[in-house]
């Protein structure tokens, strides 16, 4: 998925106009629907999955994405581990999953770059106005 970041970057600047239902770019709603988004639900994972599907280079890669990634971040993480696709080392054009403590709540993002200090720069859907993850 060498083009994953590129797929995500084209949506930078898109914002919600109605909480997890309507967006400043009407095409975005249909885009995240490909990733399994249902109106009103958090859409970070659906956004990442839609970007992955767009950047898939082979039918086999597309099939794996459909099987592993879901609209729920932590379910996707469990699926990736089970499929042998998990790595704790982030790389550009990969997907990062964050867990909120020990809860079943998480967040998913596209890794754009890994910085020299080890932090990552991401492109995300469904972040709050103050930058917080939803």
Model-found features: residue ranges?
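...with weaker cross-activation on analogous glycine-rich loops/strands in unrelated enzymes
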Residues: 58-132
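N-terminal capping segments
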Residues: 1-58
């Amino acid at each position: 998925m060498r083009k994953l970041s590129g797929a995500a970057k084209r949506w930078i600047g898109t914002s919600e106009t109605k909480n997890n239902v309507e967006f400043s770019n009407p095409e975005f709603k249909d885009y995240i629907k490909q990733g399994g988004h249902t109106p009103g639900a958090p859409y970070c994972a659906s956004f990442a999955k839609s970007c992955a599907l767009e950047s898939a280079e082979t039918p086999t890669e597309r099939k794996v994405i459909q099987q592993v990634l879901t609209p729920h971040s932590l379910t996707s993480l469990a699926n990736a581990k089970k499929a042998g696709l998990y790595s704790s080392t982030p790389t550009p054009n990969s997907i990062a999953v964050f867990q909120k403590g020990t809860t079943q709540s998480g967040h998913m993002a596209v890794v754009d770059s890994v910085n020299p200090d080890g932090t990552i720069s991401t492109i995300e859907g469904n972040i709050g106005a103050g930058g917080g993850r939803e």
